[in-house]
Amino acid sequence: MTTPRILYCNCTYAQVVPKEVKAAVLRKLCESGVEFEAVADLCEMSARKDAALHRLAEGGVVKIAACYPRAVKWLFAAANAPLPPAGTEVLNMRTQTADEITKALFSPEMKPNLPAGKASHNGAVVIESAIPNQPSPSL
């Protein structure tokens, strides 16, 4: 099994993640010696359609410490860099403790948790059909 990459978002501009949680997660990542990538703000990167999002989305399995899984999914999709649903686990620094997040980040187990549905090339939301052999409706 491939070791998941770790991505840490500092949520610098939105300032919606508790500072104590961000600081504790970052400190534990730095102290661990585990390789990780840190970005200032995924929201800002998405708004600029930063090419780094493509590299991050296409690099294999990834665990992301940021905010809500649905928000992270759509930030990447808005930049035309969709995350692989089966290879992405998002840890929510808005609702989870630093201990919960770092335990999950350091665990070799992947728990993919992106919500169902995907973005189409024209920006429409596509709902994945739960009925086999049935087309998915577009919104």
Where on the chain are the PLM-derived regions?
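Iron-sulfur-associated redox domains of electron-transfer enzymes in respiratory
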Residues: 1-139
